[in-house]
Swiss-Prot record:
PANTHER family: MITOCHONDRIAL RIBOSOMAL PROTEIN L24 (PTHR12903). Belongs to the universal ribosomal protein uL24 family. This is Large ribosomal subunit protein uL24. GO terms for cellular component: ribonucleoprotein complex; ribosome.
Length: 106
């Protein structure tokens, strides 16, 4: 299983958001959950003057959390990633996260 990190593109494989994909905003390792952009939005009611970011208060919409076991890392082409390692591509000078996919069935 590929390790999920901030900025990865993931696809939800279980729950009410099943089949949707988005970018990971935050990984909460101790809780075993992730925040995914534009998925599992929750509403929070905030009083006036409680935060400097939103002094007028009101109803705020923010990304909720999803269990890590309910998401799967996908590549740029929306296909699942099976293996991942940190290394250099041929001719590259910098290390990067390299992804491998399952071999096609013949």
């Amino acid at each position: 299983m590929a390790e999920i990190r901030k900025g990865d593109t993931v696809k939800v494989i279980a729950g009410k958001e099943k089949g949707k994909s988005g970018r990971v905003l935050e990984v909460l390792r101790e809780d075993g959950r992730v925040r995914v952009e534009k998925l599992m939005t929750v509403k929070r009611h905030q009083k006036k003057g409680r935060s400097q970011a939103n002094p007028e208060g009101g109803i705020l919409e923010m990304a909720g959390t999803i269990a890590i076991s309910s998401v799967m890392v996908v590549g740029k082409d929306e296909k699942p990633v099976r293996r991942e390692k940190i290394g250099r591509e041929l001719g590259a000078k910098e290390k990067a996260r390299l992804q491998k996919r399952k071999a096609a069935a013949k």
